[in-house]
Design a protein with these regions (language model features):
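Catalytic-site neighborhood detector that most strongly recognizes the C-terminal catalytic loop/helix
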Residues: 107, 165, 272-324
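Flexible interdomain linker/hinge and immediately adjacent N-terminus
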Residues: 46, 51-55, 85-115, 162, ...
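Short, charged phosphate-coordinating catalytic segments
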Residues: 132-155, 265-270
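Conserved tyrosine-mediated DNA breakage-rejoining catalytic core shared by Y-recombinases
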Residues: 144-183, 187
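Non-catalytic DNA-binding core/recognition domains of DNA-processing enzymes
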Residues: 12-86, 173
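Short, basic (Lys/Arg/His-rich) helix/loop patches that form interaction surfaces
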Residues: 222-270, 274-277
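Active-site/catalytic core of tyrosine-dependent DNA strand-transfer enzymes
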Residues: 174-240
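Basic, Lys/Arg- and aromatic-enriched nucleic-acid-binding interface segment
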Residues: 110-139, 250
Length: 361
């Protein structure tokens, strides 16, 4: 489908995932104006456009959260900017309502996530929840993530988020999340889907598995997770809950990784894809995936939802520590044996020297 030039210019200014949200807001503006042709938005003169934008803003202030309004207006402003229309942005922004303290910053607890997992039988939903809770990925990763971006590393999985983008970073899935993801892929194969490197890691619903797979959209991800929240304790303040539908899964991972006393903050920030909180690391903290994975493994017990998986990881950790201690003791024993042998050889040498000296006397 060929886009009208005015919409194509708008499209060129943003990435695919942003375009979906921006066009949705632009279409709402079109509907408010009673228009169906995007070119009609450009027929008015600059003064009329300014007045229309101000009227739309006043309308939004009556029905929308103060914190949400800038994200509604931004797509409309971009449309006019890309089509070379002049309006007084400073004046318009002066009319924006004062931002309020936002709710929705709480993390899900393990109990919350356990309730979410128990409330669904869908393997895709279970895999999604555990993927987001263990990788700390933003929901925007899902519409771009391919199977080629996910590879095995020990009993976990390594994930390349935003592949080939300036925001690219490496994160990981716990053994628990990895198993759920494998179960989901197995289900797709049983439905006759041929999995390839370019296949979506998470695909849209389908009737037949062999139909061309399409990537899940962010809206679909939110809808799938929303269904699992019925019994999760949340408090509503204004139009928002204290725990956000998807982002609180990322918050869970953030808390789990950084609450450890031995946490390496720089590496944890890299794993979460927001190293800007450690500014110099953006240029000098280029950690290899192997190094990041060693840091991630320390947090696996805290990131595991089912106690069974947490126990497995703890047993594995204890066995590794026990083996390490055993190896250390073995090395020390061998060292003592070598030292003892060396001492015996020295004594023998001294005895030989004393014997020769005695014979001379």
């Amino acid at each position: 489908m060929v886009l009208p030039r005015c919409l194509n210019l708008f499209r060129q200014a943003i990435v695919d995932t942003t375009y979906q949200h921006y066009k949705y807001e632009l279409d709402r503006f079109m509907k408010w104006n009673g228009l169906t042709d995007y070119d009609d938005l450009l027929k008015a003169d600059d003064k009329a456009i300014q007045r229309n934008l101000e009227d739309y803003l006043i309308h939004l202030k009556d029905i929308k959260s103060a914190n949400y309004i800038p994200s509604i207006m931004a797509p409309v402003e971009l449309f006019y900017t890309m089509n070379d229309k002049n309006f007084n942005k400073v004046r318009l922004h002066k009319m924006f309502p004062r931002r309020t303290k936002r709710s929705g910053y709480d993390a899900y607890t393990k109990e919350d996530i356990s309730i979410m997992l128990e409330s669904t039988n869908k393997k895709r939903t279970k895999a999604l929840i555990l993927f987001l809770a263990s990788t700390s990925c933003r929901v925007g990763v899902i519409p771009e993530l391919t199977l080629g971006d996910v590879k095995n590393r020990e009993n976990c999985k390594e994930v390349l988020a935003y592949n080939d983008d300036k925001e690219e970073y490496t994160t990981f899935m716990t053994p628990e999340a990895s198993q759920a993801f494998d179960d989901y892929l197995e289900e797709r194969q049983q439905d006759h889907e041929i999995l390839k490197a370019e296949s979506p890691a998470f695909r849209k619903d389908y009737r037949l598995g062999d139909t061309p797979a399409e990537f899940m959209k962010t809206g679909t991800v939110r809808s799938a997770i929303t269904v699992t929240l019925k019994n999760v304790p949340r408090v509503k303040k204004g139009t928002r809950f204290n725990k956000q539908t998807v982002h609180s899964l990322r918050k869970f991972a953030d808390v789990a990784m950084k609450s450890r006393h031995d946490c390496n903050l720089s590496k944890c920030e890299k794993i979460m894809g927001h190293s800007v909180t450690v500014p110099m690391d953006n240029h000098y903290g280029s950690f290899l995936p192997e190094s990041l994975f060693e840091e991630y493994k320390k947090a696996i017990p805290d990131l595991s939802i089912d106690e069974q998986w947490k126990l497995k990881e703890q047993i594995k950790k204890n066995e590794e520590e026990s083996k390490s201690s055993k190896d250390t003791l073995t090395d020390e024993l061998h060292s003592l044996k070598r030292d003892n042998l060396d001492m015996k050889e020295r004594f023998a040498s001294l005895e030989e020297i004393i014997k020769k000296l005695s014979e001379k006397d």
